Amino acid sequence: MSLWGDKPPSVASSAPSVGPRRGNSISKILNTMPKRLFLRLYKCLRLAMPRSLSICVWLLKVMLPISLAVRVLQYVGFIDWLAAILTPVFNLIGLSGDSAIVFLTSIFLPLYPTIAVMTTLTLTLREATILAVMCLVSHNLPVECSVAHKTGSPFGRIVAFRIGMSIVAAIVLNGLMPQGDAPFSFLASATAEVTSWGMLLMQWLSSSLTLTVTIVLIVSALMVLQRVLEEFGWMHRIAHMLSPLMRLFGLPTGCSLLWLTGNVVGMAYGAAIMIDEVEQGRLKRHEANLVNHHLGVSHSLLEDTMLFVAMGISFWWIFTTRLVLAIVAVWTMRLLKR
């Protein structure tokens, strides 16, 4: 018979049972973490969607009538007539008279139809580079300047500023670029010529449907992303990382997200965040005005620039010219206000 009776002592049972309790508490935390994360993400989605939909409606109210009006002006020959008047001006900045058609198309429309017109002309690589920079500064002005107007910049003034900076950029490049007659050649897919009002309307409806879907998807995604960045405290980290760059550009450090958005997705698609930042009071209107002037010259630095680089135009001429002129423009504005 055992000294301890029928039941020998258990070392394990005599020790305090701390392990299982601790394991259960850790397990509970791990189980609740996905739920907490889900609730926070759902909160971001719930806050973002009403705001994004209202901005989508505003953007489409601006974009769709303008795109129809421009198609009508092209169809009746108004753009060609205006281009003929501007031919002498373009000759002064090292461009042929035909280039005026490309620039005028750019003023009213996004870059893709502008590039389609550009590829129909016989240009040298030097002329194509100058024209590309002009179009990058001044494209889709009715829409992009409406966004700028809603965030603190007078519509007429920002239109005049961007067209003026296009001409300044052309003058600078015409003076700096070496003379050359290397041909610019890029094979583009043929576009169907509009031969009737019915065809014009059908093309507009088709492009409008694509535009509507694109805007809803991009704007909604951007607004949700903005709320997520705020919810998890990442907005301040981004602003802190980009603050030295903003100071170099002459911009307030609080506009880091606007600058980043404008250079990743452009001013039209980035309008949601830009408008929201101002209307929610996170950025003052005079600060947004400085950002609008900077982005007016230098925005969508990745996508828009690479469109022309893919056609054989130098990345450095396009990138450097726009960025330097944007910095000079903002610092000039700040100095004139002192």
Residue spans for each PLM region:
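Alpha-helical membrane segments and immediately flanking helix-loop junctions
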Residues: 96-153, 249-308
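Selected transmembrane alpha-helices and immediately adjacent juxtamembrane segments
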Residues: 28-89, 163-246, 324, 328
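Hydrophobic alpha-helical transmembrane segments
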Residues: 60-61, 71-81, 100-115, 129-132, 154-165, 203-206, ...
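Ser/Thr/Pro/Gly-rich low-complexity, intrinsically disordered segments
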Residues: 12-17
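Transmembrane helix-loop-helix hairpins in multi-pass inner-membrane proteins
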Residues: 138-195, 303, 308-338
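Juxtamembrane "helix exit" motif at the C-terminal ends of alpha-helical transmembrane segments
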Residues: 69-79, 113-118, 230, 301-310, ...
